[in-house]
Swiss-Prot record:
This protein binds specifically to 23S rRNA; its binding is stimulated by other ribosomal proteins, e.g. L4, L17, and L20. It is important during the early stages of 50S assembly. It makes multiple contacts with different domains of the 23S rRNA in the assembled 50S subunit and ribosome. The globular domain of the protein is located near the polypeptide exit tunnel on the outside of the subunit, while an extended beta-hairpin is found that lines the wall of the exit tunnel in the center of the 70S ribosome. Part of the 50S ribosomal subunit. One of its GO terms (cellular component) is cytosolic large ribosomal subunit. The keyword Ribosomal protein applies. It comes from Nitratiruptor sp. (strain SB155-2). This is Large ribosomal subunit protein uL22. It comes from the Bacteria. The gene is rplV. Keywords: Ribonucleoprotein, Ribosomal protein, RNA-binding, rRNA-binding.
Amino acid sequence: MSKAVLRFIRLSPTKARLIAREVQGMNAEEALAALEFMPNKAAKVISKVITSAVANGGYEPEEVVITSCRVDRGPYLKRFRPRARGRASRIMKPTSHVYVEVAQKKDS
């Protein structure tokens, strides 16, 4: 089993979790092929983390399964936007932590 972590990525955790749920339990090769055609920023980020997890274990993508793909909420970047009458509105820019674990397939 090998893992990869990407922390403090400027990505909404809510949007990233939608993609993470799709690939969990899939073969790594199939997951990377599916993520390649998804038009989301989260798909590109998660595919890089999966590739890293596979490389960390010294495996090939076709011989591993994604056992866990988790996205946690990171700290918010707080920004301010000027508004009328000298006021300001707070803009919250979310960050995420992406965790991926892969393990070798069990041949039955």
